[in-house]
Amino acid sequence: ITNDVAKQIADQYQKLTGIQDGYGQPNIDNKSFGLLARIDWNINQNHKLALRYQHNNSYDDNYGVDSKTYMFTNSGYRMNNKTNSIVAELTSHLGQNLYNEFRASASFIRDHRDVAYQGPTVQIKNVRGYDQKTNITVNIGTEYSSGANYLDQDIYTFEDNLSWYLGNHTLTFGTHNEIYRMKNLFIQAVNGSWYYNSLDLFMQDKPYQYSYKYTDPELTGGDTQWAPAMKSGQFGFYAQDKWDVSNNFNLTYGLRIDIPVIFNNPTENPTFNEYAAQQGFNARVGENPSAKVLFSPRVGFRWYTNDSHKTLLRGGVGIFTGRVPFVWLSNAFNNTGMEMKGTTINKKDAEGNYLNIA
């Protein structure tokens, strides 16, 4: 868009909201700072302890623009990340044939978005007319999803592996456990979002739609930007045997068991639960699914096809499961239909066309 059109939009936005936004070239920046410290302690001949601390602090400016979208200078957001983690690892020889590795860690991750100001979000369509090839959409105001957006994660990990050497067999027994605490604030249109179908309608302040979202202060103790906390974990146990059948061939087989759990429940929604029961749905807001045990058997081999060990053939088969994306599941704590509230106002005529609501 031209500078004259940008100034026209900025002046009208200031007139409507009292907030002045820029329309020059944005200063996009990103920085990262990292720190690593480590201590190794040989306690004695059989025990060694390692402590490691890692810190990272970074930010990255984001502007969601493309060939069909123009965003004003202060309408982007800055993504901030701060991570602190500490790891302790103890390795021990427990006898002639026993070796143990114990590891514990704690990570504290803070992700949040910064915006230049908290103001209404405005979207103006068809700024250069209604030709689909040449028109453009303009966004001004606080970015739609960034006015109230942060994710705090505390992750605690405990792992232990015991190896037992028995001739041509190496047995491994272990456990890997993770505890999560997540607090996720995500409220779109927290300052209100206004939608206009053309530049002329924006100058006349005639929107076709308005939306606003918040958390109910009567249910959150007066907080209109409340974030739910979710506590969860994943517990893993495994056993494995590495069998050296010959100098050229070994076989590894074992079983891993994982148990993902959620420790707390989202808020109950009696209205929905009553309706679901009447409809015969086996679903209730406020209840988590019961923990499910995941079995993952595996087998693999390594085969040197000749004594010179120049050619190696490897293969295996098994069932593999990764970490459960608990941050996605935490959305269920946000969207119970209780704390999170919102309104959308629009008006249509008999043919389904939007009318101005101003």
Predicted regions and their residues:
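Short coil turns and loop connectors of transmembrane beta-barrels in diderm outer membranes
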Residues: N44-N46, G95-N97, G167-N168, V245-N247, ...
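Aromatic- and glycine-enriched glycan-recognition loops and surfaces
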Residues: I28-G34, K231, N288-S296
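Solvent-exposed loop/turn elements at secondary-structure boundaries
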Residues: P266-S296, G300-A358
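Outer-membrane beta-barrel pore proteins
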Residues: I1, P26-D29, W41-N44, Y304-D307
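Surface-exposed beta-strand-turn/loop segments characteristic
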Residues: I1-K31
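Extended, hydrophobic alpha-helical segments in both membrane/secreted and soluble proteins
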Residues: F235-A239, F249-N264, F295-P297, F301
